[in-house]
C-alpha cells in the first residue's frame, strides 16, 4: 500500500506554526482494510509513543489490527520525521503535516481534536492545547492586542 500523506488546509488569522504536540498526540482516523475494503465505523487513534510488534518479527508499527471481516492482520506506522507544522504562508492551501506507512490499512477520514499548539505571527505568543474538533478555534493575543484564530479546517489524504 505504501505511504499516505495527511494534508491539512485551514484559514489562519494572525497564527503560525500550527502543529501536533508530543509523542502522545492522538491522530484520530477511520481506517479501510486494503484487502476487503471494510471501513471502521469508529474513530481509532494512533500515537508515536505506541509501538506494536508485527507477527513473525517483521518489525513494529503504531497500530496492528485484525480486520473484523476478512481477519487479515494489517498495520499502520506514523513516520515521525514527516511531521511538519502548518504555517501562515500555507494559509488556505493543502500542506502535508504527516505521512503514514500503510501495510493493509488505509486512512480514509481524520478528526482533529485537542493537542495542537501554535504561535502568534507578530508576537510569538504561544498557544497550547488547541482543540480543532469543531474545525474552528479562536483566542486573543494579549501581546499583539489582536484576535487569533484557525478556521475552516479540512483535510485530504494523498498517496506519496
Swiss-Prot record:
Keyword Iron in annotation: no
Return the InterPro entries for the record. CXXC_Zn-binding_euk (IPR008584)
The observed outcome of changing residue 33 to A is: Disrupts protein folding and solubility
**Gene Ontology MF terms in the entry:** zinc ion binding
Which residues pair up as cystines?
A: none
Q: How does it assemble?
A: Monomer.
The record comments on the domains as follows:
The N-terminal and the C-terminal half of the protein have a very similar 3D-structure, suggesting they arose from duplication. Requires a bound zinc ion for normal folding and solubility.
The UniProt family comment states:
Belongs to the UPF0587 family.
Its recorded name reads CXXC motif containing zinc binding protein
